[in-house]
Curated annotation (Swiss-Prot):
Taxonomic lineage from the root: Bacteria, Pseudomonadati, Pseudomonadota, Acidithiobacillia, Acidithiobacillales
Organism name: Acidithiobacillus ferrooxidans (strain ATCC 23270 / DSM 14882 / CIP 104768 / NCIMB 8455)
Pathway terms, separated by semicolons: One-carbon metabolism; tetrahydrofolate interconversion; Amino-acid biosynthesis; glycine biosynthesis; glycine from L-serine: step 1/1
Keywords: Amino-acid biosynthesis, Cytoplasm, One-carbon metabolism, Pyridoxal phosphate, Transferase
Catalytic activity, reaction form: (6R)-5,10-methylene-5,6,7,8-tetrahydrofolate + glycine + H2O = (6S)-5,6,7,8-tetrahydrofolate + L-serine
Complex formation: Homodimer.
Protein name: Serine hydroxymethyltransferase
Length: 414
């Protein structure tokens, strides 16, 4: 029998100390990693609920375990809300992550050795879109497309020519570091012209799509995957949307193909997040996310740090640091100043991936805590001050104190 009163702090003080310090870090640091956000207390309550105890292999109404009548309700709510949010024909909410969602889609209609065509990781794509170090790049032949050197944007005419030449069985659209609107309608036309499937990974922009602030890929794609955190602001997890004709294949690939029991506590948290995303204020939040990213990009450009492609249409942008400082050095210096970013390769980067010539900046988390235009100006100048003097301890300490004071004005959880 376990204790009903013993706390983690009492039982495992070393772990509790790490948890406590991480909570403090989240409160005291400005979070600008584009893939991170703060889940609401309701999402975290669902994820920390008794649903974590329940095994439920199968799908609602078709389980391999008894006692699933209540978790069936939770999963059905998540599915129904996902369909309402995105207007899709079928939703699978069991994928443990976006990576597993992508893997399930690949294996549902492709065979090892088939060719896929995805955006190059070096140009803003994602590991799971065919990178050599990922299973997607090991199981399948890969033809990678990228952006134009002159403006950092996808060249759709070149993509069409490449697709005609390479004849992939599936085209993968979506990115992890691309700041412009993606023309899913055009990519859908390209895929159909060669008889290829279209998978859109909208993990980064799902919140924008849900609120109509980015064109939806759903009408144009055979499959759409996403994570449920990032701009959706839910728990860490995955979601697959697809046409009804692929529903059975996708479901079978998730279970029993790739996974066993679903994480019912996470699925419940997804249901909460989807309900939050259906509220009118969620669109206002997403509008502010975009406005903050555009404001921050302009402030930094005014200080001599231009964004790849010249700006942003969404929640993120890449700074090309050129010869001033490496991405690794910038990440470390900004971290010391209580500003969290990640080093990131820029298109046609001459530096290795562990060093890079750029950093990726995103505004979902900062916007969640209440930052607006005024805070973006203050933040942008702080970032530029550090980048201008990345080895100056006095500058870093001054910016750190300012960022900590700013964070205290806008607490995340209180």
């Amino acid at each position: 029998m376990f204790s009903k009163t013993l706390t983690i702090a009492d039982f495992d003080p070393v772990l509790w100390d790490a948890m406590r310090k991480e909570a403090r870090r989240q409160e005291d640091h400005v979070e600008l990693i584009a893939s991170e956000n703060y889940a609401s207390p309701m999402v975290m309550a669902a994820q920390g609920s008794v649903l974590t105890n329940k095994y439920a292999e199968g799908y609602p109404g078709k389980r391999y375990y008894g006692g699933c009548e209540y978790v069936d309700i939770a999963e059905q709510l998540a599915m129904d809300r996902a369909l309402e949010l995105f207007g899709a024909e079928h939703a699978n909410v069991q994928a443990h992550s976006g990576s597993q969602a992508n893997q399930a889609v690949y294996l549902s209609v492709l065979q090892p050795g088939d060719k896929i065509m995805g955006m190059s990781l070096a140009h803003g794509g994602h590991l799971t879109h065919g990178a050599k170090v990922n299973v997607s790049g090991k199981l399948f032949q890969v033809a990678a497309y990228g952006v134009r050197a002159e403006d950092g944007r996808i060249d759709y005419d070149a993509m069409a020519e490449q697709a005609e030449r390479e004849r992939p069985k599936m085209i993968v659209a979506g990115a992890s570091a691309y700041s412009r609107v993606i023309d899913f309608a055009r990519i859908g036309e390209i895929a159909r012209s060669i008889g290829a499937y279209l998978l859109v990974d909208m993990a980064h922009i799902a919140g924008l799509v849900a609120t109509g602030l980015h064109p939806s890929p759903v009408p144009h794609a055979d499959f759409v995957t996403t994570t449920t955190h990032k701009t959706l602001r839910g728990p860490r997890g995955g979601l697959i949307l697809c046409r009804e004709q692929y529903a059975k294949k996708v479901n079978s690939l998730i279970f029993p193909g790739l996974q066993g029991g679903p994480l019912m506590h996470v699925i419940a948290a997804k249901a909460v997040a989807f309900r939050e995303a259906l509220q009118p204020e969620f669109k206002s939040y997403q509008q502010q996310v975009i406005h903050n990213a555009q404001t921050l990009s302009k402030v930094l450009a005014g200080r001599g740090y231009g964004a790849v492609s010249g700006g942003t249409d969404n929640h993120l942008f890449l700074l090309n640091l050129g010869e001033k400082v490496t991405g690794k050095e910038a990440e470390e210096a900004l971290g010391q100043a209580n500003i969290t970013v990640n080093k990131n390769a820029v298109p046609f980067d001459i530096r290795p991936p562990a060093v890079t010539s750029g950093i990726r900046i995103g505004t979902p988390a900062a916007t969640t805590r209440g930052f607006g235009e005024a805070e973006m100006h203050r933040l942008g100048n702080g970032i530029a001050d550090v980048l201008d003097a990345s080895s100056d301890a006095a500058v870093i300490e001054r910016v750190r104190a300012d960022m900590k004071a700013l964070c205290h004005q806008f607490p995340v959880y209180g």
